[in-house]
Each structure stands twice: as structure tokens, then as C-alpha cells.
């Protein structure tokens, strides 16, 4: 949940993805016909090669490959590749050619060259001080290799400097990993009938595209697939401070389960219910509000929890809530950043105490670098502006890969019916919706006392899933038997 209280450059592309982020404003007439220049440069070396797919992923530093990588290179996802250069003390500024070659098991895929004057060393924050190549998604494959070299514009008899090419000979492995073809999202417009208005959300192509772009920029995916479902009619109140949110979330999750049963949804789809409980965001949230809700999904096999809800008012904040809540549905807890420190369910393993992003970010759509020392914080906190940390990015990659890659294994587990018991913020209990779950749930085990026929008592194990932003959650218990009359959880009694 969230709460409220380039410069275009000239580049020569040779049979590879076009480059729109790098190069020189005055140069751009590099080697022709795809052949590499003849003479490696003297007095200048490749100090670093990094690739950016939302975050910076260093590939080599001072001639040494980075292994292991801090975050994965995602197969089939477009990228910016930056070549950093460092001159020797006696370097005389002059024009050089930096060439990137990409290959695969079949040979050379293509090459790009950038030609411009080098006056000094590359600096991360100075975009134009590095040589920046856009790499097409199709050129980032499991068998992709690369090499970079700095060449003299004119043939030279001077011996090249160490480090003028990486690797010194041959090619280096790019190391792209696969997490599946896409992330699938289903928007569920909630027709708001609690006040008799029948109010619906903006699910126009333009608004859906805002959601898609926000998720694509941050999530480690090739593609974000979004479809819009038929509306869900809702007659109950959902208050700004949490009452009614859990009931609506469970209903959206139950609709997903029903759609699966009727073969109109797939198990790898995440549902997102959008609702407008007032005419405007301000009128609903003028004194603060809950903006979205999910249930913490511990394991990839908790497919029944692949859903969230959030406010659906037009604007950028809806997109921010969308990616935040979907992060919860992928098992992410909160990053430790919120106004006045008011935040629950903080991830104890989050590596940055201020909720920061940890490394340089890069917006693939606006072509802007995001400074980790700046204002941006991880999207799983409550602070704005947001980006994504390397910690969250890697965790999402692993979860998305599991969802896309282990479906055949998951279907081998038998399905059983489990009854949901809702726990409200005040600890009171209510009977929720039933879910079909494969295998044993992975929530927190809770002891549940069941009162059976004739007042008999037995103890069963329930599994608790907390809500992402409000107190409470839901406990899954084995389907009640005939004659079961009541349950007791944490000292609270509920008649069935």
C-alpha cells in the first residue's frame, strides 16, 4: 500500500540496434561497411563497461570482468551500454572511434561506432563523457557476447595502450538470463455502487499505457501485457483508513480464481482491482488514506494471492501505486522510507537504511540517469520520487522467473479447498471466501481451534497472510467439516 499524509546524439549503426542515446553532436561518421578501424588507440583505455536496463549492471572494471553481477542482465530487454574511458596523463585531446561489437554462436550480429573528441575521463553523472550505445532487445540473448575497442581515426604506427580493447582478444560473455516472455496484468474496474453512483475508473488506452510504461521502466521484464476485465460491481463502503479494503481485495482474488475455473484467465496473470470511492482523489484522501492493498505472497506457488487493489483516479500516482502493490503480490515487503517513519511490514533484509536505490538507475523511456545519491527512493517505500533498487530488482527477477518458469511443476501439486478467515485491524474475525490452493500454503502457521459437532474440539494449522499496509490479514484453514460450528484464533471466537 501507499499512503499520502537527452540529448540526441549522432551514432553510426552497423547491422545492430540503432543508438539514440550516445555519440557526438557533431561527429557520427565512423567506420564504413561494418569493418573495424585498423589501429587501436594509444594513451586511452577502457576503464569500465556497464549495461543499463533500468539499473546499472557493471560488466567489467579496469579490464576485470565483474563476477558475480549485482543484478541480472535480462534476456530480450532493451538496454543502454556505456563505455567509460580514461586517458593517460600525457593524453592529447583528439577524436577517436569507440566500437561495440555484439556476437552470438553464429558469429557477428552487428556493430556500432561512436566518433568524437575525448578531452578527459568519463564520469558516471556526466552522460556525454561516456560512449553510450542503445542495444536492441533482440540483440540481448543467452549466447550474446561483446567486445569494445577504442581506435584512432587515422591509421597509426604507435603501439596501442594496454586496455584500449576489452577483452584484449576475443569476446566477453554478456550473461543475459531469462525470466520469461512477459509479466501479465489484468485490470479489474470496480463499479462503485456504495453511494449509488455506479462510478467507474479511467481504463482508456492512454491511462492503461501509463500503467504499462511505469511497470516496464522499473520491472526486469521484456514486456508488460495488460488486459482489462469486465467490471466488478461493489456495494460496500471502503474507508480511507482501511475498513472494507480487505473484503474488496479478497473478492478480486476470488474473481481471479473463478476466472481460472472458467478458463478465461491464466495462472500467471496478476489481477489489479481499481476503484474510485469518491468523485476525486482529494475528496477521498484529504485527511490521508490507504491507496492500495495486497496480501503478502511468501512463495511463487501462492498463486491464489496474485492480485492487488488500488485507487484508480487518473494521474501518475495511480501508476506508482500499481507497481508498488504488484511488488507486494510478488513477495516484496516495504523499503524503510516513509514520512515520519510511519510504515509497517518493512523488509529486514533491505540493504539501504534510507530506502534508497543503491546504484545508478536509467529510465529506458526518457533516457535519463537516476542518481542513487539523489532524492529517488525504492518503489516499495512511501517516499517520492521513486525508482527501483538493485535489491528489489533482483528479487522481482527471481519471482517473475519462477512464475514464468515453474508452472509445469506447480500444476503437479494437488488442489485443495481452504477457507479464509479475515482478521480485521481490531482483531475481530469474519468468514471470508474459499480458495483452491495447490499443496500446503506457505503463510505463517497459526494454531486454530475448531469446535465440531456436540461441542467437540480439535486443533488444526492455519496459515496467516498479513495485509501489506493495514493491520490484519487472512488465515487459511482446512475446509470445515460437516457439523463444524466455530473457530477460535488468537483468543477470538467466530461462529461458522
Per-segment meaning from a language model:
Residues 376-427:
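Catalytic cores of secreted or luminal carbohydrate-active enzymes
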Residues 46-97, 413-443:
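Contiguous beta-strand segments within globular domains
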Residues 106-126, 230-233, 456-470:
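Solvent-exposed serine/threonine-rich low-complexity stretches and specific carbohydrate-binding patches
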Residues 121, 138, 304-386:
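The catalytic-center signature of Zn2+-dependent metalloproteases
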Residues 1-39:
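Ser/Thr-rich, Pro/Gly/Ala-heavy low-complexity intrinsically disordered linkers and tails
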Residues 154-194, 493-496:
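Short beta-strand elements
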Residues 139-164, 448, 480-494:
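Short, aromatic- and glycine-rich surface loops/edge beta-strands on solvent-exposed regions
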Residues 175-344:
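Active-site-proximal segment of zinc-dependent metalloprotease catalytic domains
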